């Protein structure tokens, strides 16, 4: 536990020191920052804000994790597990980096095409499966102690889980501080589970990433000086999915990650209902004022009759939701 705290503090310090230099470099090079194409008017002032901050906390977290792992976890099983998680984080980080790079430096509005991004994400999931899942012989989903053996279909589940949650966290990263703190809450919940299981290798990775993310939040809270970009959000979502699989607690991510599930579900429901009503009535209708769900809250709260919610209020509501959901999972598992 001391090792995890020490590593987390080092990650916090290094990220906190490096981030201002990254922001300054961004500004000195006059790189075009975040573009805003949204209907939420209060977001227009954010146009040009530096992005790709995930590059910094990912490099810090993965580098420290590799160093600490090589020094303190020399057995093959732990190194294989740590390598599997870190590789999927790096691969998804690279995917996000390419996406951000094309948008910002090459002025390609959509970045990677949906097909390109999905293909790369599948490859990342396969790498994790080959490095961690196959050697462990795992082929079952653990749900409340019951193991559902899927055989080869477990590969499909792993790919669905990793790709799905990487994109879900990406959708969540839409207002200042929301994704970074939401992921910290989720990681802390998995830190408790890892500690209870004696999985100190996973706990180390969690502690380092939590430290790096807390330092990033110093620059990402409203008004944000920098955004994490796809490089950060895609990697963090993949990390959460990989950790839930590594700890054999896959189902918990549906609850611990309730914020990401809600954000993604709102988009899927909105698109489906809009297409259905357009076909049936000749005009598309909406369930939510705007999606993902955090924009729905910004434009009128839960009821729609309230005044527009500030970003801080939306953040506080969704952070609290994630925290309560995480505590419920821990209560189910250990009380």
UniProtKB/Swiss-Prot annotation:
Signal peptide residues on this chain, from the entry's feature table: none
The membrane-topology field of this record reads: Multi-pass membrane protein
Mind listing the UniProt keywords for this protein, alphabetically? Answer: Cell cycle, Cell division, Cell membrane, Cell shape, Cell wall biogenesis/degradation, Magnesium, Membrane, Metal-binding, Peptidoglycan synthesis, Transferase, Transmembrane, Transmembrane helix
- Keyword check for Iron-sulfur: no
Q: Which GO terms describe its molecular function?
A: metal ion binding; phospho-N-acetylmuramoyl-pentapeptide-transferase activity
Q: Which cofactor does it need?
A: Mg(2+)
Give the GO biological process terms: cell division; cell wall organization; peptidoglycan biosynthetic process; regulation of cell shape
Q: Which reaction does it catalyse?
A: UDP-N-acetyl-alpha-D-muramoyl-L-alanyl-gamma-D-glutamyl-L-lysyl-D-alanyl-D-alanine + di-trans,octa-cis-undecaprenyl phosphate = Mur2Ac(oyl-L-Ala-gamma-D-Glu-L-Lys-D-Ala-D-Ala)-di-trans,octa-cis-undecaprenyl diphosphate + UMP
> CDD domains annotated for this entry?
GT_MraY (cd06852)
Disulphide bond pairs: none
Kindly report, in one word, the top-level EC class recorded for this enzyme.
Answer: transferase
Membrane-spanning ranges: 3-23, 53-73, 78-98, 118-138, 143-163, 174-194, 200-220, 226-246, 251-271, 314-334
In which broad location class does this protein mainly occur, judging by the first location in its UniProt entry?
membrane
The UniProt entry, under InterPro entries, shows: Glycosyl_transferase_4, PNAcMuramoyl-5peptid_Trfase, PNAcMuramoyl-5peptid_Trfase_CS
| Protein location | Cell membrane
Q: What EC number is given for this enzyme?
A: 2.7.8.13
Q: Outline what the protein does.
A: Catalyzes the initial step of the lipid cycle reactions in the biosynthesis of the cell wall peptidoglycan: transfers peptidoglycan precursor phospho-MurNAc-pentapeptide from UDP-MurNAc-pentapeptide onto the lipid carrier undecaprenyl phosphate, yielding undecaprenyl-pyrophosphoryl-MurNAc-pentapeptide, known as lipid I.
Family (UniProt): Belongs to the glycosyltransferase 4 family. MraY subfamily.
> Any idea what this protein is called?
Phospho-N-acetylmuramoyl-pentapeptide-transferase
- Originating organism: Streptococcus equi subsp. equi (strain 4047)
Species classification: Bacteria, Bacillati, Bacillota, Bacilli, Lactobacillales
